[in-house]
């Protein structure tokens, strides 16, 4: 695994970049103060194939899989995806608002997309995440916290924490203790 070096003007300096059209400007970019951990797999329970890239770019082909026909018109994105092998792709500049949290609330404040960074792990609620993913997530988190100091350990949450009636990610197999033990 290679170490993540830095963030410059909201972009990781040394990772794969694919621009998603599914974002807009934050109301206040200086207010970035929450990190939200998600999981995604397309099709469900399947990994690889590049379908998350297609989905976040609005290019998912509904004919490829029955599930895609249900979701291909959704306009969603995350700031980054960490694949099973640990590779990180950034889709949205951290200073912009990705559309990952939906209806959400953190400590009484709604619209978490306004002040949150969203990280997707390629995974599901049916199996553990990989060592490579934990390594990359820990490295990425430390670089994000250095660049956005309002994000502290107590402001790192799962999607399930900000949308508890709608979402379960990052799920039962996400090892919060392992992850947070290496976050500085």
Swiss-Prot record:
Involved in cell wall peptidoglycan recycling. Specifically cleaves the amide bond between the lactyl group of N-acetylmuramic acid and the alpha-amino group of the L-alanine in degradation products containing an anhydro N-acetylmuramyl moiety. Zn(2+) binds at residues 38, 159, 169. The gene is ampD. It is an enzyme of class 3 (hydrolase). GO terms for biological process: cell wall organization; peptidoglycan catabolic process; peptidoglycan turnover. Residues 30-171 form the N-acetylmuramoyl-L-alanine amidase domain. The record marks 167 as: Transition state stabilizer. This is 1,6-anhydro-N-acetylmuramyl-L-alanine amidase AmpD. Zn(2+) is required for amidase activity. Its EC number is 3.5.1.28. Keywords: Cell wall biogenesis/degradation, Cytoplasm, Hydrolase, Metal-binding, Zinc. The keyword Nucleus does not apply. Transmembrane segments: none annotated. It holds the Pfam family Amidase_2. GO terms for molecular function: metal ion binding; N-acetylmuramoyl-L-alanine amidase activity.
């Amino acid at each position: 695994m290679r170490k993540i070096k830095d963030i410059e003007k909201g972009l990781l300096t040394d990772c794969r970049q694919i621009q998603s059209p599914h974002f807009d400007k934050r109301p206040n970019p200086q207010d970035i103060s929450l990190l939200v951990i998600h999981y995604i797999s397309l099709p469900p329970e399947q990994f690889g194939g590049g379908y998350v890239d297609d989905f976040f770019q609005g290019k998912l082909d509904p004919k490829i899989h029955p599930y895609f026909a249900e979701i291909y018109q959704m306009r969603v994105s995350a700031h980054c995806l960490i694949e099973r092998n640990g590779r990180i792709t950034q889709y949205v500049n951290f200073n912009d608002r990705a559309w990952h949290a939906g209806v959400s609330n953190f400590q009484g404040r709604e619209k978490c997309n306004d002040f949150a960074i969203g990280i997707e792990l390629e995974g599901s609620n049916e199996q553990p995440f990989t060592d490579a993913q934990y390594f990359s997530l820990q490295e990425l988190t430390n670089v994000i916290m250095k660049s956005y100091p309002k994000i502290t350990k107590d402001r790192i949450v799962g999607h399930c924490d900000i949308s508890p009636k709608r979402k379960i990610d990052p799920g039962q197999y996400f090892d919060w203790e392992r992850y947070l033990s290496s976050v500085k």
